[in-house]
């Protein structure tokens, strides 16, 4: 009887040990924290640069002839086209709104005009030929609406307010009799420079070149208001232009700071351990 009890106990112990071995669970592998990786987000700030060509339309010019009470229009007044170069800094507020401050320079644009009056000892009717040129520096605050992104393209419209510093060179005036004969000596009027109010309207599209570089191609209409043009000399002047329109085609690029997101590191799972 005792042997039977001992045998039963031995069998029970062996069964318990076997069951414990079957349900043994290994200790979990130690948790290894992945290295911290920061995802770069676009800050919104960007730099821009542009080159363009401006088709200029002078609205006319006028001057005082003989006295300060006799304001006369030029018979003709034309301003040639010029190249532009510009740069700026801006901020992208969201997917649709952005704004920037820009500074543009328009290269020398030649002026050709004519006036009608009297000249010579007679005096006789004369027509004067007038030659000058201008350059312009423009500072603008602009706002844009991006009209959605289609593939790599983002069309936009915008507008800006600011001022232009227009610098006229000396104006050379040569009067010649309408009936023919010797012309008067050329008279030089000192050029004027001044700040004027200006506004502009824009439309164009940007093209994604990389994650933080966009090409920008567009059209810009600018109206620069009237201002002083030249001073008094030899019983003529001063004179002023009536402002001018600029129709500009430009191309450039925008560089966004922090515009490239970094991929998030995901560690591979640890292999399962079986016993």
Where are the predicted features?
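Outer-membrane beta-barrel architecture
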Residues: 40-48, 82-86, 96-98, 136-140, ...
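Residues on the lipid-exposed face of transmembrane beta-strands in outer-membrane beta-barrel proteins
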Residues: 49-53, 87-91, 101-103, 141-145, ...
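Outer-membrane beta-barrel channels and translocator barrels
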Residues: 42, 94, 148-153, 208-210, ...
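Extracellular/periplasm-exposed beta-strand and loop segments of Gram-negative cell-envelope proteins
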Residues: 56-80, 104-138, 164-196, 224-248
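Outer-membrane beta-barrel biogenesis signature
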Residues: 19-47, 60, 258-275
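N-terminal signal peptide c-region/cleavage motif recognized by signal peptidases
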Residues: 15-16
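Sec-dependent signal peptide recognition
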Residues: 2-8
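Predominantly the C-terminal beta-signal and adjacent terminal strand-loop region
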Residues: 108, 210-275
């Amino acid at each position: 009887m005792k042997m039977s009890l001992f045998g039963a106990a031995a069998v029970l112990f062996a069964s318990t040990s076997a069951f414990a071995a079957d349900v043994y669970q290994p200790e979990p592998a130690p948790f290894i924290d992945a290295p911290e990786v920061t995802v770069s987000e676009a800050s919104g700030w960007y730099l821009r640069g542009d080159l363009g060509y401006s088709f200029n339309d002078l609205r006319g010019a006028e001057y005082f002839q003989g006295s300060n009470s006799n304001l006369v229009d030029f018979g003709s007044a034309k301003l040639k086209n010029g190249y532009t170069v510009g740069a700026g800094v801006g901020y992208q507020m969201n997917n649709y709104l952005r704004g920037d401050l820009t500074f543009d320079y328009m290269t020398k644009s030649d002026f050709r005009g004519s006036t009608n009056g009297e000249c010579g000892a007679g005096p006789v009717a004369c027509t004067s030929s007038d030659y000058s040129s201008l350059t312009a520096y423009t500072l603008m605050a602009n706002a844009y609406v991006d009209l959605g992104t289609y593939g790599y393209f983002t069309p936009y419209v915008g507008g800006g307010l600011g001022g232009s510093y227009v610098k006229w060179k000396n104006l050379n005036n040569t009067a010649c009799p309408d009936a023919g004969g010797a012309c008067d000596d050329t008279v030089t009027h000192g050029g004027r420079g001044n700040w004027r109010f200006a506004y502009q309207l824009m439309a164009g599209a940007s093209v994604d070149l990389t994650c933080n570089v966009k090409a920008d191609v567009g059209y810009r209409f600018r109206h620069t208001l009237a201002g002083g043009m030249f001073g008094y000399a030899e019983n003529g002047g001063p004179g002023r232009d009536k402002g001018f329109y600029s129709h500009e085609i430009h191309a450039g690029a925008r560089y966004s700071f922090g515009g490239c997101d970094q991929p998030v590191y995901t560690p591979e799972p640890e292999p399962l351990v079986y016993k």
